[in-house]
Regions:
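Conserved beta-strand->loop/alpha-helix structural units within folded catalytic cores of enzymes
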Residues: 176-177, 195
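Alpha/beta-hydrolase-fold catalytic nucleophile elbow
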Residues: 194, 213
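Short beta-to-alpha loop/turn elements within the nucleotide-binding domains of ABC transporters
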Residues: 185
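Domain-scale signature associated with acetyltransferase and cell-envelope carbohydrate enzymes
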Residues: 1-145, 166-172, 179-181, 189, ...
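Short helix-loop boundary/capping segments
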Residues: 150-151
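A short acidic, glycine-rich active-site loop
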Residues: 158-167
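Short acidic, glycine/proline-rich loop/turn micro-motifs
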Residues: 154-158, 224
Length: 232
């Protein structure tokens, strides 16, 4: 009996039905929107919805993209902020944690693979291109920025440095809490990034099953994460 009551309470009070109906039918073709793939929890702020949302998945279903639920048992229920001027391509199941911020600039493209999880209080700021592969998990308070926000000049070479550089995170990456993934970061598949690390370069030649740690991050050991339900 308790389970049924709890389920009813969750449906009524936890799910943000105004946001669910508004966002799905505003941003998706009717045949997709009617399935309500976007599921919003608690508070959400739509700062800008001028961009495009493209779901590239044949199995679109109710609640496949969950926004604002992850981490709600641990952190204050601050609103998720959605700021989409550019294009967000979604290839599968996606979770965005409570209190997170998603920004995609007008000329930018954010691509997220299947089974991508952004933890609570994550900040993703896409000014050019951010690509996240399949089965990626970000812990809480991470930031993913493909921009420095300002131009800078190398005084030795007199060269103006690039402000924006793409980010590409490989599949089966696990990113610990409070990591900073900065512009130019590229990782191979099957990499762990230890908590409080800063990544800011191309790590594509790094062997799979490496652990990156530090600021800036470097390889410290080789280890494999076991995914519940897959490896255990």
């Amino acid at each position: 009996m308790y389970q049924y009551i709890n389920k009813i309470v969750t449906i009524i009070f936890v799910h943000n039905w105004i946001a669910i109906l508004y966002f799905n039918f505003k941003k998706l073709p009717f045949k997709q929107a009617i399935k309500l793939p976007f599921d919003f929890y608690y508070k959400v702020r739509f700062k800008n919805l001028k961009g495009k949302i493209i779901i590239k998945n044949e199995n679109i279903h109710r609640g496949m993209i969950k926004i604002g639920g992850r981490g709600s048992e641990m952190f204050p229920r601050n609103p998720v902020i959605i700021d989409i001027s550019g294009t967000w391509i979604i290839k599968g199941i996606t979770e965005v944690g409570i209190g997170s911020y998603i920004h995609v600039a007008s000329s930018a493209t954010l691509t997220t693979g299947n089974k991508v999880k952004l933890g609570a209080l994550n900040k993703l700021y896409c000014e050019k291109s951010i690509t996240l592969g399949d089965e990626i998990a970000f812990s809480w308070e991470c930031q993913i920025f493909d921009t420095n926000f300002h131009y800078m000049k190398d005084l030795l070479s007199n060269k103006i440095l690039e402000k924006d550089t793409l980010i590409n995170i490989g599949s089966f990456n696990w990113i610990g809490n409070r990591c900073s993934i900065m512009k130019g970061t590229i990782t191979p598949n099957n990499v762990i990034i230890a908590s409080n690390s800063l990544c800011n370069k191309d790590y594509s030649l790094t062997p799979e099953f490496s652990v990156l740690a530090g600021s800036p991050a470097k390889v410290v050991k080789n280890i494999k994460r076991l995914f519940e339900g897959t490896d255990i």
